[in-house]
Amino acid sequence: YLWFLYKAMTAIKEPLALITTQDYLLPCTKWQEEGRWEVTDDGQKRLGYELPNFSVRQKDNVYIVNEESLSEALTECGDNSNLLFKKFLTEIIPDFKNALIAALQKQNDIECILTICNCPSLNAAAEKYNIPVINLELGPLRSPTYLFTGYFDFSGVNGNTEAEKRYFAAKQQGVVFNKKNRISALRDFFINSRNDDDYIEPEYDVGIVLQVENDSNILAFSNSFDNQALLDYAEGSFIGKKIVRPHPGSHFRLNENLGYEIDNNNLSIIDFLKKCRKILTINSSVGLEAMLMNIPVKILGDCSYAFCNVDDVDERVERLTFYLFSYLVPFDLLFNAEYIRFRLTFPSEHEILSKHILYYLSSREKQSIIDMKTSTTDVVENGMYERGLLKELEELKIKNI
């Protein structure tokens, strides 16, 4: 997770407390020699960070966690690193928790902890000092195809998230989502390209989306499904023509099989989805993209968007609207100190919606206000809410002229 550290150090200018292992602080030249994507120009440009110069960050407090704190757990896992990772993601590891407590007790002014993984050991250590833990990750909709989104969750990421709980809380708070929206309109708001409108007659009954074998989604939040179990499930549960899309980051290649065709990422993901009447996934974000294209999805694992996958169309629109505009966060805000502090006040869902929609509108500053009106989804209260934000934005622009 080098990018996570580099992004935080680039975006957050004030002093940080870094709890890490020694290898994260090695010179970037080492990672360049090993060809890691995080130190390439493309990686930096895509995620908006610079390679850090640790020597000029003297005000950062760095706490090195000894990896020996995980050695007993690794032994218990039979030296299986994947099993250890699952344990790391789902259980409290006593020695590791104590190592984190030792690091936290050296710093008495921590506002929150930013992490990229579910980590019960970290949660337990932070709870001892009443420090909020915020789980951040790349969101399911990403640039350049979509507006870049991220996950910002006080409960978990990938699995064990607060998405569904927050949706029902928003309803109780009186947030009125516009049921007259079409799912295609929601997608149109987030998609950057308008060149995918050509209709393609689906030729496959089921599209099967595979995932990286040792990713946290599979190891910890798959309801015990892996790629092989997914293929077995598809064979036993679905008749008709099938196509399988392996993940480009997979370490394995599928053998040819009479039961399905293979798309080795020759198609764009959008063209792949267009060719399918239904999508089967464990918990890939491709499932969300399919839902936004009105393609039926079967989700077998745990994921943040699964609660949106309901049969009632009006209810699905409401849930997707909340998920896209309130639960998901504009990526540029993930490491924004002002935004993080805003969320630490536990604002209402109306306030979160307002912050996100206003960001999306203002980020399209090259557009005229009239153009923005035509490209804005009427999310809340049949559009009255957004029209108020547009008026606010227009007045702000006039003041700055």
Predicted regions located by residue number:
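Catalytic donor nucleotide-activated moiety binding site of glycosyltransferases and closely related
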Residues: 67-79, 83, 210, 229-264
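Active-site and donor-binding regions of nucleotide-sugar-utilizing enzymes
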Residues: 2-8, 52-159
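C-terminal amphipathic helix plus adjacent low-complexity
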Residues: 167-174, 308-401
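Active-site donor-nucleotide binding/catalytic segment of nucleotide-sugar enzymes
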Residues: 195-250, 345
